[in-house]
């Protein structure tokens, strides 16, 4: 991970345009290729970001970060206050809470509760940056990665997106790999981001699954 604290301005050019005027900010460049711009506020939320895969071109005082859709973050560095890189290694990830862990077991047994025709290939399929909860096959024979959450939020969409980048590079799998976020509830923001990323969402009923009753998911 690279940490850069700098006085900078940031311009986003894509489906719309956005400008952050000059200020001191933290620029995070992660090993997965993502770049995010942070202020000293907003908790964990960045002011702007670019999800992987993307290409970073460093010129004299200017970074150009371009994703596969040709959207760009242009970071103009006026003064660098700190610049360091750190090897964090492979993170073991958060342990799932009891409900999420049980949901994974139940949905592994009944993947068709996520989407009709879905069958399980493997639980906890390793991606190199953490295991995706379920690796499945749909009725068309395509590979589907399922990430399971108690509540589906933007973080879950981002996590699934990172996994898909790795899975699409896995020579052992048929490509492309499709992604579905499965949860008891999914926020509107997460639904919107998932749709933008080409991901599916499935709302599943934990109580019905525990009772072995038919579960009717909502697909988006």
From Swiss-Prot:
Q: Name one Pfam family in it.
A: NucS_N
Q: Name one GO molecular function term.
A: single-stranded DNA endodeoxyribonuclease activity
Entry keywords, A to Z = Cytoplasm, DNA-binding, Endonuclease, Hydrolase, Nuclease
What is its subcellular localisation? Cytoplasm
* EC number assigned by the record: 3.1.-.-
**Keyword match Nucleus:** no
Main site of residence?
Answer: cytoplasm
Which Gene Ontology CC terms are recorded?
cytoplasm
Show the InterPro entries listed in the entry.
Endonuclease_NucS, NucS_C, NucS_N, NucS_N_sf, tRNA_endonuc-like_dom_sf
Taxonomically, the superkingdom here is: Bacteria
- PANTHER family in the cross-refs: ENDONUCLEASE NUCS
As for what it does, the entry says: Cleaves both 3' and 5' ssDNA extremities of branched DNA structures.
State the similarity comment.
Belongs to the NucS endonuclease family.
Name this polypeptide is given = Endonuclease NucS
Species per Swiss-Prot/TrEMBL record: Frankia alni (strain DSM 45986 / CECT 9034 / ACN14a)
């Amino acid at each position: 991970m690279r940490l850069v604290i700098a006085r900078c301005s940031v311009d986003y050019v894509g489906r719309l345009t956005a400008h952050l005027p000059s200020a001191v900010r933290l620029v995070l460049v992660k090993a997965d290729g993502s770049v995010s711009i942070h202020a000293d506020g907003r908790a964990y939320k960045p002011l702007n970001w670019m999800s992987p895969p993307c290409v970073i071109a460093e010129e004299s005082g200017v970074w150009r970060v371009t994703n596969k859709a040709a959207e760009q973050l242009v970071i103009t560095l006026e003064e660098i206050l700190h610049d360091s890189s750190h090897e964090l290694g492979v993170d073991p990830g958060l342990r799932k809470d009891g409900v999420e862990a049980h949901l994974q077991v139940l949905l592994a047994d009944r993947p068709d509760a996520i989407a009709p025709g879905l069958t399980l290939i493997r639980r906890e399929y390793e991606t190199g940056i953490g295991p995706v909860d379920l690796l499945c096959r749909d009725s068309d024979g395509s590979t589907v990665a399922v990430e399971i959450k108690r509540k589906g939020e933007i973080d879950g969409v981002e996590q699934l997106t990172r996994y898909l980048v790795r899975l699409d590079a896995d020579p052992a799998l048929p490509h492309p790999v499709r992604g579905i976020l499965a949860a008891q509830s999914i926020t509107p923001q997460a639904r919107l981001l998932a749709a933008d990323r080409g991901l599916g969402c499935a709302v599943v009923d934990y109580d019905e699954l525990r009772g072995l009753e038919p579960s009717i998911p909502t697909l988006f």
